[in-house]
Amino acid sequence: MSTAKLVKSAPSELLYTRNDLDDSVKTSTIALLNQLVVDFIDLSLITKQAHWNMRGANFIAVHEMLDGFRTSIIDHQDTIAERVVQIGGVALGTVQIVGKQTSLKSYPTTIHSVQDHLKALAERYAIVANNVRQAIGKTEDEASADILTAASRDLDQFLWFIESNIE
């Protein structure tokens, strides 16, 4: 099959799929999901940055907790990115795109205490959790909403755990 048959003609730029969602639903859902792919990639990297660089009371408990969070975030990120492709989009997750489009403030690299990291993480986890909840309400694709609902449950739990460790 030629490439021309795989790509619909402009302006929609959707890849061919037999998925019968309306093209406008696909396009709007792809935009929502790709923003979340960016945010999840950034959140996973921020989580690892904190994991590597914290010191102080409760270090090992928080250090290990963050490893589990990151694994789950990466799993959700993968599911969201794959949904983009399933409905005819291109998942956008390069470091250049993440750097330009993330919803998150730059993570401070000059903090070291567990408490400072927890506060910085709580702020960023809340942003992503809230963005996911908003996207659930905006998408007209039930399968995407279901994927986001699962991610929302985990992010809310992670935020709760982080906030519960802040003194």
UniProtKB/Swiss-Prot annotation:
* Superkingdom, taxonomy of origin: Bacteria
One GO MF term, please? ferric iron binding
Q: Name one GO cellular component term.
A: cytoplasm
For Fe cation, which residues are the binding ones? H51, D78, E82
Q: Does the keyword Oxidoreductase apply?
A: yes
Give EC number(s), comma-separated.
1.16.-.-
Localization, per the record, is: Cytoplasm
Q: Fetch the Pfam families from UniProt.
A: Ferritin
UniProt keyword NAD, yes or no: no
Q: Which InterPro entries match?
A: DPS_DNA-bd (IPR002177), DPS_DNA-bd_CS (IPR023188), Dps_gammaproteobac (IPR023067), Ferritin-like (IPR012347), Ferritin-like_SF (IPR009078), Ferritin_DPS_dom (IPR008331)
Coiled-coil annotation reads none
Q: So what does this thing catalyse?
A: 2 Fe(2+) + H2O2 + 2 H(+) = 2 Fe(3+) + 2 H2O
* Chief place where the protein resides: cytoplasm
Q: Which family does it belong to?
A: Belongs to the Dps family.
Please give the subunit comment from the record: Homododecamer. The 12 subunits form a hollow sphere into which the mineral iron core of up to 500 Fe(3+) can be deposited.
- The protein in question is named DNA protection during starvation protein
